[in-house]
Amino acid sequence: VAVTLAWLGFAAPALAGPPEWGRAVVRIELKTDAQLYLYQFKKEIVQQTGEPLNAAKVDESLKRLYATGRFVSLRADAEPDGGGVVLTFVGKARYFVGLVQVTGTPKPLDSSTLVAATRLPLGRPLYEDELATATQNIRNVLRDNAFYQATVQSSVERNPATQEVQILMTITPGHQARLRGVAFNGHAAYSPDRLRSVTGWHPGDRLTSPEIEKGLYKIHNFYLKRGYLQASTNIQKRVFHPKTNTEDLIVECEAGPVIEVHVRGASISRHKLRDILPLYQDGVIDQPSLERGSRVLTNFYQQKGFLRAEVTIEPVEHIQADHMRITYRVALGPAGSFAGYKFAGNNHVSDAILASVMTIRPAQFPFQTAAFSTRMLDDDINSLKGVYQSQGFLDAQITPHFNYYYQDLPQRLFVTLDIQEGERTMVGQIDLQGVTDEQRKALLPGLANQQGLFYSPENEQKDRDTILRYFTNRGYSHARVIASSSPAGQEHLMDVRYQVRPGNQERIERVVLLGNKHTREGVVRRELSFRSNQPVNESALLDSQRRLYDLGLFNQVQIAPQNPQTQETDKSVLVSMEEAPRWTVGYGGGIEVQRLGSNEPQGQLKASPRVSLEVSRIGVGGRNQTLTFRGRLSTLDKGADVSYYVPKFPKRPDISVRLNANVDSSRNVLTFTARRKEASIVMEKRWSQTTFLSARYSFRKVQALDLSNRISASQIPLASRAAQIGMFALSYINDHRDNPIDATRGSYSVADAGVSWSGLGSEANFLRFSAQNATYYRLTPFMVFARNTRLAIESPYGALRHVTVTQPDGSQQIVLTHAIPLPERFFLGGSDSLRGFSINQAGPRDPQTGFPIGGNALFLNSLELRFSFAQDRLGVVLFHDMGNVYSSIRRMKLLKFYQNSPTDFDYTVHALGIGFLYKTPVGPLRFDVGYAVNPTRYQVAGQNGLEVRRLPRIQYFLSIGQSF
């Protein structure tokens, strides 16, 4: 005879004294359709083996098992076994949402949008009806984007070991419908043809949901500009025609009344009026809305310098049933200026602290304009009161006093803020309830409110957050903290109480990885800040999510505990990942306009088209490693390089290694074609997000070609000889810029030192050092001052080296030389350096041909004043560049601004100029015009002897990105 007691979330019926009750339980079993085991539920099962079978205990066990959220249904079976009874809990396991994937997503939609539309959050229970709802949600999104014929099939894969279910939504999108026509219903006030022209929708278009919203927004703006402030537009219906795969849009338009808004007594543009008046945003015409508009206009005119401006509202005129007129009357008063403010009576809070929250400000030549209005002042007074309350002065009062005749000048306003601080409220007793002695000992020192210190409501809220964070980071995800304060029995003394309800501590039973098809499990687990058998730490979950995103291997990462809404203490943590495409192909093209290579020493103004290709493969071998190939081709250079990047080497998060190999041939120096073959290895140590040190070894073979008629014939055999360079170098970089592409604040510093040595495989021994420092200062919201300084030197060392060169007649000659190979010398000039020269035209030149031959020292200092307009879309730059390339560090004379002769190039060139910028998604598009104040003179040997020439004073540059 079997006795069954069932639990489906309600009380089980009592059974009247069957023969099994009271008999000893010899064994307890658990049978489910998932891999759940009895030891996991020791706390929930109160009926124990060896005890008499008790109906109340069995019923309580069923209740507790069901409360874990692990079961859809449960029952208890009791069967005789010898002299006792076997108690079996039989249940149907509940499954939880795991990885949700969508395949077949049509363009222009993306899979992440459709996954979000399913509304199936990771780790939550999956109910029977939710799958159908999720499928319908995806269909709705597809229909909203004109995929009416799309079909969506859902499939699930249950994992009994983890109780998670993987959901796959397969889309067959069909063809996107085209627009057949647009009809308008309602009181539109304009013809359908006029409104259709406004939307930008045309027959034959494939309209997505964003494009429809954009068209509706255009109609709304169309009405707004014509005074229909209460107009409403929405899609009433979308009619699909299956035979032609087209759709009709039915748009409902209600124009509403025409509302004229006039401002009398002062001028203001219609555009500005639409921007600042509330009724243009919400369309509400009532007294509170009109009064808000009055205050906004008062603030506007006072900031314009009319410090006593007042704005009143005239009664609303109803011209017709559908036509109203609203008039604001402005009394500007005399124009004035705001001279400044001061604090009086602040004995405990410094002027500097108080001034840090003020928004009103006097004008300061040359960059800062004045800002003042009574509204700004009221907001500042509230901010000052907040500062005082945070310092314990709960009753502080601040009264402004206005002096409109400051320094005996009429309409020159000075404000004195008279502060009555009052008594400071102190903290009496601190009562931390609901915690253990160990927890109290850990928490009390970290609280902002401390006994004997000043009391602050702000600190009370901070303490609540501190306590809550302490518990949630230790597995108490359901913790609650109630903060309260009460008078301590004497004046200006507050007792503070924190009532804590921690709930049950949750621990991580296991970590389940989902979606890492190609990425190795170890790569993922190394980034996790939590492990099994640790308390569930919400901060660790968020930190792990951030670290996985930082790998660059995943498009989306979600981390959540399974079954989060129950009081179950042993949690599975799910890590769901959507892997990014492993292969990426990028290509581009462009044109560079500068003085490029020619037979003339100064070059000719030419356009250089260029194309580039980049192919990268992430996750090589399932690891966090990247292989990249890059190729480029232009009239200036051509080349290719391959790199292999290994971050976190070997498992250190602060060390990375990069292997590089490249081959290129470039003509960016007029004098020669530089051919280079190079291999290098770079190891980088990152100290922080802004600072890192790198060490690199590079081995390259360089050669200068096409030297005929560009340098003296006697120098060609040595200069054209191929040279091997083996160099070890260290670099230090400190980057505090707010935006590396277009910085407005911060600084950037780099220092690099290298040695080329025969012991490293080099045929030329020389030392090289370079340094750069750039700083950026925002002077006003629309003006940035930027400075960049570069210094570089190189010097040969050691004994003269024996070099075998081949003469033009084929004979070989041994030469003793210290010369640094031509492609290894410094060159300067161009859009991102010294804009008084074209690309790489600065510095020493050959005394016979006049072509640049580079130098062993370089200095550049650039100053820029950057202005922005049109909401930062346009910009103007005024710049001054100074510097040059020098033959050696000993001949670097920064204060020498002239040449002694046409063969003396060791002087400093100054260049002034202006640049124009247009912001694009890839960076600022920049056109610069540079003017050399003291351009270089050089000599050229001609048929009639030496001829002295001068480089052009004016240079033109077109490029993308800021110069530094």
Give the residues covered by each predicted segment:
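Periplasmic polypeptide-binding modules associated with outer-membrane biogenesis and secretion
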Residues: 15-597, 610, 614, 628-646, ...
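Residues that define the transmembrane beta-barrel architecture of outer-membrane proteins
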Residues: 134, 215, 293, 380, ...
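Transmembrane beta-strand segments that form the barrel wall of outer-membrane beta-barrel proteins
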Residues: 528, 560-561, 585-603, 613-634, ...
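C-terminal outer-membrane beta-barrel translocator/porin domains of Gram-negative envelope proteins
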Residues: 550, 572-573, 584, 590-604, ...
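Repeated loop/turn-to-beta-strand initiation elements of outer-membrane beta-barrel proteins
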Residues: 555, 583-585, 619-627, 649-657, ...
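Outer-membrane beta-barrel architecture
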Residues: 574-576, 614-616, 628, 643-645, ...
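Residue-level signature of outer-membrane beta-barrel architecture
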Residues: 617-619, 646-648, 663, 685, ...
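Transmembrane beta-barrel wall of Gram-negative outer-membrane proteins
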Residues: 636-722, 730
